[in-house]
Amino acid sequence: MCRLTLAQQPDTTFDQMITKIAAGSHRILSVSFYARRTLTVARDLLGKHLVREISGTTRAGRIIEVEAYVGPHDRACHAHKGRTKRTEVLFRSPGVAYVYLIYGMYHCLNVVTERLDYPAAVLIRAVEDETGLIDGPGRVCRAYGIDLTLNYHDLTTGQKLWLEDRGKRPPRSQIGSFPRIGVDYAGEWAARPWRFRIASVRRKTRKAQVTPERKRIFLES
């Protein structure tokens, strides 16, 4: 039995946080899953599956690493300096995708959390699928065909891009917490241990493995 609780709805059960989409154990994470404290959502995303569908082809990977960005007071959060055209999506309802570009070439996928008008999100940093470990937010987006067209996408609809619970959760003892990466500009906030990873999965430096056919489907559609 899962012990997750909603701050807003303390009696909400895990089954009420997810929407059943098939007779099996695959369930799309619903708005209620995301509408909780960001650090809780971040930890609970580990072991869930990122699912991408393009032209009838579906690819799914187990989430291995995430980072939490919590509100306007968090100096590492993009919304720290206020509401702008770029950060407007962070103020939207929980369960929306925030996709942005770094270095002019790498996309990063975040899921918006907590509540309307409160800017918070979780960055998806690594997944593991049939090709192996895909480590790094840019590599994840490249392998799964995620780009700026999916910014503001509703992740709870089960269309194009969504997150699933497939019934397996890593034990708390296997979840490590570490400082976030690439946020040295955030001062003392850079040291917050808000990066979470399934510790049993070792880090690897590798390119996202995409077969020629999969590359054609996911990157050229």
PLM regions and their residue ranges:
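Conserved, well-structured core segments that form or line functional sites
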Residues: 14-221
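Cationic, low-complexity basic patches in intrinsically disordered or flexible, solvent-exposed regions
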Residues: 9-10
